[in-house]
């Protein structure tokens, strides 16, 4: 709903911020709580 959220890595490391524009999908750009995803971490401006 907010256009952003956080991903919890499987290795238990610190949560990662994710903006909806970073989601690559052919459908709606949404993630559900508990959904498993693959991701690459990039450093950027806050």
From Swiss-Prot:
Q: Gene3D superfamilies attached here?
A: Nucleic acid-binding proteins
The UniProt entry lists the main location of this chain as cytoplasm
Print the keywords alphabetically: Activator, Cytoplasm, DNA-binding, Stress response, Transcription, Transcription regulation
Keyword Nucleotide-binding assigned to the entry: answer is no
A molecular function (GO) term: DNA binding
* Induction data: In response to low temperature.
Identify the InterPro entries for this entry: Cold_shock_CspA (IPR012156), CSD (IPR011129), CSD_CS (IPR019844), CSP_DNA-bd (IPR002059), NA-bd_OB-fold (IPR012340)
Record text on subunit structure and interactions? Homodimer.
Q: What protein does this entry describe?
A: Major cold shock protein
Q: Which organism is it from?
A: Yersinia enterocolitica
Originating gene: cspA
């Amino acid at each position: 709903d907010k256009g952003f959220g956080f991903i919890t890595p499987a290795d238990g490391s610190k949560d990662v911020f994710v903006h909806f524009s970073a989601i690559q999908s052919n459908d709606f750009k949404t993630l559900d709580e508990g959904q498993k995803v693959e991701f690459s971490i990039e450093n950027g401006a806050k």
